[in-house]
Amino acid sequence: MLKLLLLRHAKSSWNDMDLSDHQRPLNNRGLKAAPKVGAYITNNGFTPELVLSSTATRARQTTQLVSEQFPEPVETHFLDELYNFSGFHTPLNIIRDQADQQSPLMVVGHNPTMEILAAELTGAGNSAARAMMHEKYPTAALAIIDFDIPRWADLQTGIGTLVQFIRPRDL
């Protein structure tokens, strides 16, 4: 059984219009939400073996603040491919390329990628969580998905079970 955590970056700031989209940092709300999500991950036994994150500043900050809540450092890779949206197939293939022992695997990215990926991968699971996820995938929201497969290379759409969908306001 493999476990995937799909985390949308925390709330970002639009205050400095001179910054490119890639450079936008977290705002105060995002700075408060990310550690709460990290604590939730740790306290519920979902600490990842590997984190893959977008290279955008807001995703990097989210990754750092979440990871600071883990009991020990976790291997982390920052990938440009998780910033540039080119359909859900790009992140899906990135996940498929990971070593099988790297579970839980956490991906930190952006919408619409995280929302589409979570929706496409899940075919079953907690009905209330699925409804909440399909309604809106807010910033710093986390989908926890189980797959009854032995290898990430076997990952297909619709085979995941949504275990939980967590929003920062619920923590």
Identify the role of each PLM range:
Residues 49-69, 148-171:
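Conserved histidine-centered catalytic loops in small-molecule metabolism enzymes
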Residues 122-163:
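Domain-level recognition of soluble alpha/beta enzyme cores
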Residues 44-46, 97-103:
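Glycine-rich phosphate-binding loop signature in dinucleotide/nucleotide-binding domains
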